Amino acid sequence: MTDKEHDIVTRLKTPTQRDKAFTELLKSYGSRLYWHVRRIVVSHDDAEDVMQETAIKILNGIASYKGESSLLTWCYRIATNEALQHLRRQCSLFQPIDALGESLAEKVAGEASFDADRATVLFQQAVALLPTQQKLAFNMRYYDELTYEQMSQITGKNVNTLKTNYHFAVERVKKYLKENAL
């Protein structure tokens, strides 16, 4: 944990400084966490809902934060778990979470900005269609540029498992792009 993170954690645990420290935490990590969540749930509205739940969990759980990993990694873990929980709630009891890929791919097309070119939309759809664990590994490595060790701390998964998931995700994305190229 860095000195800055230690300072934020200390102030988050102090009732009179909590609000200001939380604002600083969001200023430092909010955008990264939002886009991490957004790539998992796709929809802006869903990402906002997940971020609210994440904020609540961070504030309620800060007392139990032990500093064994960086504050950012700890926040990522909470955001990841909340995003996956959100996806599970969207599923019916009998539909596996990985079956959401098709509907997420459709959301990508609907959420795409007008200036997004076809290649960008295809790429985002390819990622949305990945199985959950591959998508998670891909997003963390490709977009968030996290190391496998950081990813392991966030997900609780073995580094080799994450490397395998990332490798297969890259292969699936390439295959999707080749099959759907103009």
PLM regions: where:
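Internal acidic/polar
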Residues: 2-7, 93-116, 120
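A short pre-motif secondary-structure segment
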Residues: 137-141
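Arg/Lys-rich amphipathic alpha helix in sigma70-family domain 2
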Residues: 64-66, 77-97, 116, 168
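Structural recognition of an alpha-helix C-terminal capping motif at a helix-to-coil junction
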Residues: 35, 49-56, 69-81
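DNA-recognition helix of helix-turn-helix
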Residues: 84, 126, 134, 149, ...
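Sigma70-family region 2
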Residues: 14, 39-42, 53-70, 89-91
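Amphipathic, Lys/Arg- and hydrophobic-enriched alpha-helical face
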Residues: 26-44, 61, 127, 172, ...
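N-terminal module of bacterial RNA polymerase sigma factors
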Residues: 1-32, 150, 182
